[in-house]
Regions:
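Conserved Nudix-box catalytic region and its N-terminal flanking loop in Nudix hydrolases
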Residues: 55-95
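Active-site segment of metal-dependent pyrophosphate-handling enzymes
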Residues: 98-142
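Conserved beta-strand and immediately adjacent loop positions that scaffold enzyme active sites
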Residues: 46, 55, 153
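Short, ordered coil/turn segments that flank beta-strands lining enzyme active or ligand-binding pockets
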Residues: 52
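A generic structural micro-feature
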Residues: 38-41, 70, 123-130, 148-151
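Nudix hydrolase/Nudix homology domain
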Residues: 2, 127, 131-133, 137-198
Length: 198
């Protein structure tokens, strides 16, 4: 494991460790694209955060954003200022949920052939991104603080609640953004269970 530091725009210093299995993403996103001979415009990340009760953090998108009122994991595009793809993941987690990453565990193999990464376009369909999602440990799961420009609410959902996209408490629907998000979250639960059973 390697310790990482990065100065965040809000002066928060991101400090986290990561498993060797994700060291491939401990490089600038442009360097990753060049090394892997990819022509996508950029990379994006997602953070799967679980609490002590094995529930996952889901954020509800703002009503005036694309895919309004739908639910997703924290994440977003890498910035040119991000020291690495992993730093981009930790920064997005901080900006969207106010949570500090302490450890990045593994990447979710949600792509074709069981490889990590899902390719998608921006709203106009003119820019292409590949999103890598990671399971991330945080300082305190009880301290979620949303950016109201991006998200309006959050829930901690069980695997069963994600499968039916409905919270038991209050019988509230939690429709996920798309089938890709459903797959990422389901795979995150499966990998976590396999690790705990080992």
């Amino acid at each position: 494991m390697t310790e990482q530091d990065s100065l965040k725009k809000t002066t928060l210093t991101l400090k986290f460790t990561f498993d060797d299995s994700v060291s491939e993403w401990n490089v600038d996103h442009r360097e990753w694209l060049k090394t892997h001979d990819k022509t996508w415009d950029s990379l994006a990340t997602g953070a799967l955060i679980f609490d002590a009760s094995n529930r996952i953090l889901l954020l509800q998108r703002a009503p005036d954003d694309s895919m309004p009122n739908r639910w997703e994991i924290p994440g977003g595009a890498c910035d040119d200022e991000d020291e690495s793809v992993l730093h981009g993941c930790a920064r997005e987690l901080w900006e969207e949920a106010g949570l500090e990453a302490t450890h990045i565990r593994h990447v979710i193999p949600d792509g074709a052939g069981g490889k990590p990464g899902q390719v998608f376009t921006n709203r106009t369909g003119k820019r292409f991104f590949c999103k890598f999602s990671f399971e991330v440990d945080v300082v305190d799961t009880r301290d979620v603080k949303l950016d109201p420009k991006e998200h309006q609410d959050h829930v901690w959902a069980t695997e069963d609640e994600v499968k039916v996209q409905r919270m038991r408490e209050g019988d509230r629907e939690i429709p996920l953004t798309n089938a890709i998000m459903v797959r990422v979250v389901e795979m995150g639960f499966a990998l976590r269970k396999a690790r705990q059973d080992a």
